């Protein structure tokens, strides 16, 4: 009986201490880089705001083509793919990978 009570007291105190540590860990002030001189800091802040406003439109970028026209100059293939499908070691077309 004494062991059960002792175990309960130890676990209760342990849980309190653990909860306190985890709670306090979120309130720590993290070190930040030193501020720049006023003019440079204003320019830095302005550039940060500008860069966050314009999203990167990756999907609309023009895809790289190895050649122009309908005939592949290396293989003589007519109407085949415009770019090498195994650039990354997989057969992929417009981001979709096939394995056969």
From Swiss-Prot:
Keywords: Chaperone, Mitochondrion, Transit peptide. One of its GO terms (cellular component) is mitochondrial matrix. InterPro entries: SDHF4. GO terms for biological process: mitochondrial respiratory chain complex II assembly. Residues 36-68, 85-100 have a biased composition (Basic and acidic residues). It is found in: Mitochondrion matrix. Residues 1-31 form a transit peptide. Pfam families: DUF1674. Residues 24-100 are annotated as: Disordered. Plays an essential role in the assembly of succinate dehydrogenase (SDH), an enzyme complex (also referred to as respiratory complex II) that is a component of both the tricarboxylic acid (TCA) cycle and the mitochondrial electron transport chain, and which couples the oxidation of succinate to fumarate with the reduction of ubiquinone (coenzyme Q) to ubiquinol. Binds to the flavoprotein subunit sdh1 in its FAD-bound form, blocking the generation of excess reactive oxygen species (ROS) and facilitating its assembly with the iron-sulfur protein subunit sdh2 into the SDH catalytic dimer. Belongs to the SDHAF4 family. Interacts with sdh1 in its FAD-bound form. This is Succinate dehydrogenase assembly factor 4, mitochondrial. It comes from Schizosaccharomyces pombe (strain 972 / ATCC 24843) (Fission yeast).
């Amino acid at each position: 009986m004494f062991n059960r009570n002792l175990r309960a007291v130890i676990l209760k105190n342990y849980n309190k201490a653990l909860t306190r540590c985890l709670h306090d860990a979120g309130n720590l002030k993290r070190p930040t880089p030193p501020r720049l001189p006023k003019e440079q800091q204003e320019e830095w802040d302005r550039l940060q705001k500008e860069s966050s406003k314009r999203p990167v439109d990756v999907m609309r970028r023009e895809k790289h083509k190895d050649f122009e026209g309908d005939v592949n100059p290396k293989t003589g293939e007519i109407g085949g793919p415009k770019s090498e499908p195994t650039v990354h070691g997989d057969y992929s077309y417009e981001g979709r990978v096939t394995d056969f």
